[in-house]
Amino acid sequence: MDKNILAIIFVAVGTYLIRYIPIHLHSKIKNIDEKVKEINEILIYSSTSVISALFITSFIKFPIIFSNVLISTISLIFAIVSYKKWNNLGISILISVVIYYLASKFLISI
């Protein structure tokens, strides 16, 4: 399997689990309102920090190759524009993943 596709799958699964696990655990455990408030204070920024870490590690690779930075920038621009248009994070992520894949296939083959 292509390394890019494998990396995209891992990031997608990681992103899904970051959102699914807290909802799943909350529905399974009863009478946790006090604990949720305490945990929420700690975990409120966890998904943002994990996504940021995934983004930074995928955006900056050494040695820095211009085509990789260009592909990531193009994908990021499409993610921002699509989010501004539809206000839907899922659609913007899907569009940016598709654009990243297409741009990596097109720009690397040049």
UniProtKB/Swiss-Prot annotation:
Keywords: Cell membrane, Membrane, Transmembrane, Transmembrane helix. It is found in: Cell membrane. InterPro entries: Brnchd-chn_aa_trnsp_AzlD. The keyword Cytoplasm does not apply. GO terms for cellular component: plasma membrane. Coiled coil: none annotated. The chain crosses the membrane at residues 5-25, 62-82, 90-110. It holds the Pfam family AzlD. It is a multi-pass membrane protein. To A.fulgidus AF1754. This is Uncharacterized protein MJ1155.1.
